[in-house]
């Protein structure tokens, strides 16, 4: 089921930090991992990626995999270089204070699942 990123932001109380014009876009699934190599091997185009990573390499991986957006959990603030790269690559970064387990549960309740 495809869900608009803005709906995710609104329902989970997230703070968008980059690529604001892409919030009207949709995600078609989700993936949670903190290992970049795992995301490169297993995430699908259109996924929302849930991670605690904040460095700019997450943007490179998201761009490579055509990820719909990155959710950074636990209130961790991304580096300024990460946000600049995300804007350049047009990758939405969403910030939440929630832990990964709760974020994934709420996304699932919205109809977003992994393993398509």
Where in this protein do the model-derived segments appear?
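Conserved phosphate/pyrophosphate-binding and hydrolysis machinery centered on Walker-type P-loop NTPases
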Residues: 29
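Feature captures the catalytic cores and cofactor-binding loops of soluble hydro-lyases/lyases
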Residues: 24-25, 33-48, 52-116
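N-terminal, charge-rich interaction modules
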Residues: 1-20
């Amino acid at each position: 089921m495809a869900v608009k990123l803005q709906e995710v932001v609104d329902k989970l109380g997230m703070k968008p930090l980059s690529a604001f014009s892409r919030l009207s876009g949709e995600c078609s699934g989700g993936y949670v991992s903190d290992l970049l190599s795992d995301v490169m091997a297993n995430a699908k185009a259109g996924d929302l990626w849930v991670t605690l990573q904040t460095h700019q390499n997450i943007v490179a991986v998201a761009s490579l995999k055509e990820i719909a957006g990155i959710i950074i959990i636990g209130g961790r603030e991304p580096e300024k270089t990460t946000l600049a790269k995300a804007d350049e690559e047009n990758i939405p970064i969403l910030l939440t204070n929630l832990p990964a387990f709760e974020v994934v549960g709420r996304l699932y309740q919205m109809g977003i699942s992994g393993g398509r």
